[in-house]
């Protein structure tokens, strides 16, 4: 049954990926979100500024908008990870068919990449995501945004000051 459960979950995950891609590329809201979550030079500058701040080498901390580098890195890591694990999974699922067109070394590498991508996803979920969403002092015992779709105005002001000021200027807050 393990194989059936694994493949059923894989089909569900790939369907979510396809739906998400269509939503982000074809809907007005999705296109707006894609622009917001797109990695820019500023995200890398913010990352290094935050590292300098955390090491006591700078007194300034980045002023994040709707998404900071953490959210963007996590989003793109998850999206590319799901794409990679889907492609390698399809190749492995159709192993006999794949062997007709691909050299054995490609299948061997596909098996390695598929396994390590799954392990990497598990480790990132266990440590990074668990800390940011549940254990970080600003959200402990959990960030309720996943339940309500909303964040507290004070939390927004502290964690994403540029977004807070934008929304305040628009009269939303």
Predicted regions: what they are:
Residues 1-173:
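Membrane-embedded alpha-helical bundles that constitute the cytochrome b-like, heme-associated redox core
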């Amino acid at each position: 049954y393990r194989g059936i459960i694994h493949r059923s979950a894989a089909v569900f995950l790939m369907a979510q990926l396809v739906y998400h891609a269509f939503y982000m590329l074809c809907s007005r809201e999705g296109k707006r979100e894609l622009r917001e979550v797109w990695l820019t030079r500023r995200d890398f500058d913010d990352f290094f500024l935050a590292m300098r701040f955390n090491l006591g080498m700078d007194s300034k901390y980045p002023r994040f908008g709707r998404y900071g580098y953490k959210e963007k890195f996590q989003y793109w890591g998850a999206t590319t990870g799901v794409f990679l694990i889907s492609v390698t999974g399809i190749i492995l699922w159709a192993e006999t068919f794949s062997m007709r067109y691909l050299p054995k070394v490609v299948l061997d590498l596909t098996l390695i990449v598929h396994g390590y991508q799954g392990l990497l996803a598990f480790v990132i979920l266990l440590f990074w995501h668990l800390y940011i969403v549940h254990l970080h002092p600003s959200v402990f015992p959990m960030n309720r945004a996943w339940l309500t779709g909303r964040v507290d105005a004070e939390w927004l002001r502290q964690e994403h000051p540029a977004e807070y000021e934008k929304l305040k200027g628009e009269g939303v807050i």
